Amino acid sequence: MAGGNGIIQAKKLDDGFLLTDYNGECFHLKSVKELKKALKKHLVNRTYIIQQEIESFTNTGEKIDFRIYIQKDYTMKWKLSGIETKIAKSGSVVSNSKYRARIEPGELAISKYYNLSKEETEKKINEITNVCIQVLKRMEKQGYLLGDAAVDFILDKSANLYLLEVQIDYAAEIKAFREEDEQRVLPYILTTPFEYAKALAGF
């Protein structure tokens, strides 16, 4: 759900279960019966996806995920415009702006948290970019008119790629009113759509 709303994490403990909601509130439940009761309270009249957690953490245990910006430029072809790493506050199960500790440059974070060399980092980013472009091309074949997108993804502890969602209306302009670390990507993503628009118009 948008902004991480509705995300709930359940962990098995030696003495029961630990349930953490998207607000960071924790519930220690002693039995499956208590767990079911708590889930019924939180899961209200909606269809949910249940999945095993994919571990993606900094070296100090903060949850991380990534956003890559893929845009069409004056060549009218998809290209990588920027990549950033969203690092959650300690204990949070989501990394949206309300529960975020900071944003780091994507290349730096991939190298640092996954112990990759410069060459390995470049190769990984190329892999991620190519996968995302293929997804966007598939969406275009389904009838979507696209020129600008952000794709959220995570890397597990072995740097395997898992896509989370494609954002086609991510409102980049709101970053101008946020912290400096979030504004860092703006020079790379704000101008490219204008290049594409000019190409479409024949300029």
PLM feature spans:
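Acidic-enriched, low-complexity/disordered segments with a strong bias for Aspartate over Glutamate
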Residues: 14-15, 21, 65, 73, ...
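C-terminal active-site "lid" helix and adjoining low-complexity regulatory extension at the edge
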Residues: 108-146, 155-203
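Conserved catalytic-core segments centered on acid/base and nucleophilic motifs
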Residues: 1, 8-9, 151-155, 164
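Phosphate-binding site of ATP-dependent enzymes
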Residues: 1-103
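Flexible domain-boundary/linker segments
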Residues: 85, 100, 145, 149, ...
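Generic beta-strand hydrophobic packing signal
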Residues: 81-83, 149, 166
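A short glycine-rich, hydrophobically flanked beta-strand micro-motif that places a catalytic Asp/Glu
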Residues: 49-53, 65-66, 141-158
